[in-house]
């Protein structure tokens, strides 16, 4: 494997060959001269609705050309922007959002119904037939009737 010193010297030599570093004795991260015109050539980056630089047919493809689905109510996205505005959500964004939210809600509903212990913790959940009358607040059959069972003999609205 190459040593760090060798890699630094190789990088310095490469920068000297391109004319980005004038000083032969030290390597700095600040450019010593400005690049103008054809000297200021950078990497080919996506611009506008198309991908890659227009002079390079390998990078300038129409694979990434999407301007919205106008038939579904989207505003058309222009080719180029001076400053990129917020164009709103496109049809694809809405479809993907609805699909992901439907999957999440389906998963949550299924697990809350069938496997609620995974989400809320595990504990014993008795059947309703396992509860006693005392736990449910039902008096014994041999117990006296309560004194007050309702307002059968009073007019409606006078007993509140």
From Swiss-Prot:
Keywords, sorted A to Z: Electron transport, Membrane, Mitochondrion, Mitochondrion inner membrane, Respiratory chain, Transit peptide, Transport
GO biological process, one term: mitochondrial respiratory chain complex I assembly
CC annotations in GO: mitochondrial inner membrane; mitochondrion; respiratory chain complex I
UniProt subcellular location: Mitochondrion inner membrane
Top-level taxonomic group: Eukaryota
Topology class, membrane: Peripheral membrane protein
Signal peptide: none
InterPro entries: NDUFB2_animal (IPR026627)
Pfam families assigned: NADH_B2
Functional description taken from the UniProt entry: Accessory subunit of the mitochondrial membrane respiratory chain NADH dehydrogenase (Complex I), that is believed not to be involved in catalysis. Complex I functions in the transfer of electrons from NADH to the respiratory chain. The immediate electron acceptor for the enzyme is believed to be ubiquinone.
Subunit: Complex I is composed of 45 different subunits.
Family: Belongs to the complex I NDUFB2 subunit family.
Protein name in UniProt: Probable NADH dehydrogenase [ubiquinone] 1 beta subcomplex subunit 2, mitochondrial
Originating gene: ndub-2
């Amino acid at each position: 494997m190459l040593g760090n010193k060798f890699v630094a010297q190789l990088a310095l030599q490469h920068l000297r060959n391109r004319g980005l570093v004038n000083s032969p004795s030290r390597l700095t991260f600040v450019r010593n001269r400005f690049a103008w015109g054809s000297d200021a050539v950078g990497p080919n980056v996506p611009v506008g609705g198309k991908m890659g630089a227009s002079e390079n047919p390998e990078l300038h493809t129409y694979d990434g050309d999407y301007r919205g689905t106008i038939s579904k109510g989207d505003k058309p996205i222009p080719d180029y922007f001076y400053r990129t505005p917020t164009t709103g959500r496109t049809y694809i964004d809405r479809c993907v959002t609805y699909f992901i939210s439907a999957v999440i809600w389906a998963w949550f509903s299924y697990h809350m119904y069938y496997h609620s212990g995974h989400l809320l913790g595990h504990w014993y959940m008795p059947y309703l037939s396992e509860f006693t009358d005392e736990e449910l607040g039902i008096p014994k059959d041999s117990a006296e009737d309560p004194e007050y069972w309702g307002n059968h003999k009073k007019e409606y609205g006078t007993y509140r």
